[in-house]
């Protein structure tokens, strides 16, 4: 018997005319390049990017962690399609110089790929 697999469907698709980042494990769209804030972040497993907004991402419960820039309340984020942990969301920053991170998302480079329009 031959099994025919259904094509993957994601909760949200980003516009094809924009450069975007996708999950390295399942190719679910994650973020537009226009939402990239900084490439100068460090994740738990290496370099990471800070984004203003993301799609197809679920959020775990917030917890306090001491990161390189001080104490923050963060929630792990995962790909809604393949459930891979991608990084975290900054829920609260306790130092005034770090407040700009609140509501923003860290995605580690080893969990995303550049997709569409990167010539």
Curated annotation (Swiss-Prot):
Keyword Ubl conjugation belongs to the record: yes
GO cellular component: a single term: nucleolus
Induction of expression: Up-regulated after the removal of interleukin 3 and exposure to granulocyte colony stimulating factor.
GO MF, any single term: metal ion binding
Tissue specificity comment: Widely expressed. Strongly expressed in heart, brain, testis, lung, spleen, liver, kidney and myeloid cells.
Post-translational modification: Probably ubiquitinated leading to its degradation by the proteasome.
Xref: InterPro entries: Yippee, Yippee/Mis18/Cereblon, Yippee_fam
Pfam families, per database record: Yippee-Mis18
Endoplasmic reticulum among keywords: no
Record's subcellular location: Nucleus, Nucleolus
Binding site residues for Zn(2+): 23, 26, 79, 82
Entry's Gene Ontology BP terms: apoptotic process; positive regulation of cellular senescence
Major localization listed first in the record, in broad terms: nucleus
Keywords per UniProt: Apoptosis, Metal-binding, Nucleus, Ubl conjugation, Zinc
Domain Yippee positions: 19-116
Main function: Involved in proliferation and apoptosis in myeloid precursor cells.
Family: Belongs to the yippee family.
Protein name: Protein yippee-like 3
Gene: Ypel3
